[in-house]
Regions:
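Extended, low-polarity transmembrane helix blocks
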Residues: 1-37, 46, 51-62, 66-143
Length: 143
């Protein structure tokens, strides 16, 4: 438990934490609430259930919706980052690798590549290793 909450008072970790939270939250809100043109909870879970058991779909939605909230306040940062990292790995392996590296910037691919996911994964791993950084609930709770 000590390692889970421990962190250095790092501005870099704080910036990484907020960057990942800001970028991932809209994706989670699409899945959980139907915001930003998303399918909402039921629609997303039905889509995920075509390929994965319902509990895994539920975990993915939670990771993308609750994870960024945890990151924003620095609560259980390593757990939130791990959940997001898992979602990024699964997305790359199941969906995006076949479309190559690049995002579909020009609309001439049949799908999105995995460059975004690789960036998010790198930030998540940095948070798993380094913790929440400055201005975090984790730092307040750490023994």
């Amino acid at each position: 438990m000590r390692w889970l909450l421990s962190t250095d008072p790092s501005l870099i970790q704080f910036l990484l934490r907020w960057t990942l939270a800001i970028v991932i939250f809209p994706h989670g809100a699409q899945k959980a609430l139907g915001w930003f043109g998303g399918n909402g909870f039921k629609g997303t879970l039905a889509y995920f259930n075509k390929s994965f058991p319902a509990p895994l779909g539920l975990l993915a939605i939670a990771a993308e919706f609750l994870g960024p909230i945890g990151l924003a306040i620095g609560l259980l940062t390593r757990v939130a980052a791990f959940g997001i990292a898992c979602v990024m790995i699964v997305a790359v392996l199941t969906t995006h690798t076949k479309h190559g590296f690049f995002m579909n910037w020009y609309g001439n691919q049949k799908g999105e590549g995995f460059e975004f996911h690789l960036l998010a994964l790198g930030i998540a791993v940095a948070l798993i290793l380094g913790g929440a950084g400055l201005w975090s609930v984790d730092a307040l709770l750490a023994p």
